[in-house]
């Protein structure tokens, strides 16, 4: 827009082919309008900031045997394991792995393998032990945290092996244990456990 309504009307009519079109006596108005619009477009062009590409890598996980406190009326539990990622703010991000349910036992043996897809921003992993219930909500048994330490191991494979004690809030007495192995052969992270 030039600010002069009459000039804008004439320029608009010239663009539509009236008054001899762009080659007619008022053709320069359409060309000026076109230049002004291009200039405005260049000046107001918005470029979104480029996102940093976050490194991602995979680790193999093995969930072995463990223990679980009794949560069912029959004196047993139906335990299963969930592994969660933890974001940069320390909050659970998403479920990375869920084991099968071992029915009616206090000494489960999952003997299960899987893959964890990790991101560079993950600071730790949470291992949770749950009791599966069919008719009611699952019962929480306990949780533990595995820290993801920034150690350069690009040239070496690394395996974290530990029987992790999980706690339901009372730090003094574990409510269960989970044997876990995390094998990392191609990334830049190693793992250590903490309660």
Curated annotation (Swiss-Prot):
This is C2 domain-containing protein DDB_G0290753. Ca(2+) 2 binds at residues 72, 131, 133, 139. The keyword Manganese does not apply. PROSITE patterns: C2. Pfam families: C2. SUPFAM superfamilies: C2 domain (Calcium/lipid-binding domain, CaLB). GO terms for molecular function: metal ion binding.
């Amino acid at each position: 827009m030039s600010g002069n309504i009459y000039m804008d009307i004439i320029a608009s009519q010239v663009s539509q082919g009236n008054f001899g079109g762009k080659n007619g006596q008022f053709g320069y108005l359409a060309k000026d309008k076109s230049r002004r619009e291009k200039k405005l477009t260049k000046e107001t062009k918005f470029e979104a900031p480029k996102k940093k590409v976050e490194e991602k890598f995979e680790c193999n996980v093995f969930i072995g045997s463990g223990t679980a406190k009794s949560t069912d009326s029959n004196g047993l539990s139906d335990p299963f394991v969930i592994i969660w990622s933890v974001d940069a703010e320390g909050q659970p991000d998403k479920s990375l792995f869920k084991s099968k349910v071992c029915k009616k036992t206090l000494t489960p043996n999952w003997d299960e393998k899987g893959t964890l897809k990790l991101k560079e921003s993950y600071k730790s992993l949470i291992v949770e032990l749950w009791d599966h219930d069919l008719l009611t909500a699952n019962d929480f048994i306990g949780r533990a945290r595995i820290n993801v330490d920034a150690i350069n191991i690009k040239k070496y494979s690394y395996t974290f092996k530990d029987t992790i004690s999980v706690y339901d809030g009372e730090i003094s007495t574990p409510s269960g244990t989970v044997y876990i192995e995390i094998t990392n052969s191609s990334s830049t992270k190693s793992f250590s456990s903490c309660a």
